[in-house]
Amino acid sequence: EIRYSDWSSDVCSSDLKDPRKTTTYGVGQLILAAAESGVEKIIVGLGGSSTNDGGCGAAAAVGVKFYDKDGKEFVPTGGTTADICKIDLSGKAEILNKVEIVTMCDIDNPMYGPTGASHIFGPQKGADEAMVLELDEGIKNLSRAITEAIGKDISEVPGTGAAGAMGAGMIAFFGSRLQMGIQTVLDTVKFDEMISDADYIITGEGKLDSQSLRGKVVIGIAERAKKQNKNVIAVVGGADDAEIDKAYEMGVTAVFPINRLPQDFSISRHHSKENLAYTVDNVLRLIAAKDRKSVV
């Protein structure tokens, strides 16, 4: 039996906009409950969280202990990871050692630094510039403590910065391996076989930006399609002009943003369905016109 945990459903809340205070504790409880229910494999999907605690909350929920410089035990949040002095893994629930835990994420960001958890994703969670720096220093300190606890530096492992550095926490505290979510999905549906006789592949996401280039759906599909010389059309809510050329190099044939008028997102989001339909209709008309010309 396999149990799945969807990160954004479990820990994301639009009402919680302070990543210094949010915690992954509940996710740890869910993982432990799944293990105790007798499952053999747990798949955790990371992304869309409101947290930045490096998985410390989840770890605490399964028995991992964190101590500050005074030797006092506490449960770190994003705002207190800088206070971690020592991590003790000896109390972790033994049943977790009997379960295979796989963690899927769609990005390859490291734990900290300019492309790490706090700098790239912190602003999406309500962090201003000063808070981003604070959170980043905390994750950097957590990385140091993890290295001391497990005897290995995992800070540069691709994906450790996912979901507020929970990727790192899943490796360090749960003995999990990280794998790209999109690759897992594509393998499951036999994508390479599916597109073998396709002329065009239409995919999309909310915004094509620097995060997209680090392994999300559009690029994951484009890289597979490129190996078979297939055309990939990305229909997106918006696109970062600075990243489009890179997307083309990675296998995307064309990018079509759906917004038809210069409107603020608060307005355009109410017209997403019709804008999407209008854009896809135009894409299909263009493809049909090309095919008719080829026949002539």
Q: Where on the chain are the PLM-derived regions?
A:
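Carboxylate- and glycine-rich phosphate/diphosphate-binding segment that chelates Mg2+/Mn2+
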Residues: 16, 22, 72, 101-163
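Structural motif
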Residues: 41, 199-200
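Glycine-rich oxoanion-binding loops at beta->alpha junctions
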Residues: 9-36, 178-199, 207-208, 267-272
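Single conserved hydrophobic/aromatic residue that forms the stacking wall/gate
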Residues: 1-12, 293-296
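Structural beta-sheet core signal
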Residues: 44, 103, 234-235
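Oxyanion-binding "anion nests"
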Residues: 134-198
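Glycine/threonine-rich beta-strand-loop-alpha-helix active-site module
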Residues: 21-32, 36-43, 50-100
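C-terminal non-catalytic interaction/assembly regions of soluble proteins
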Residues: 200, 206-292
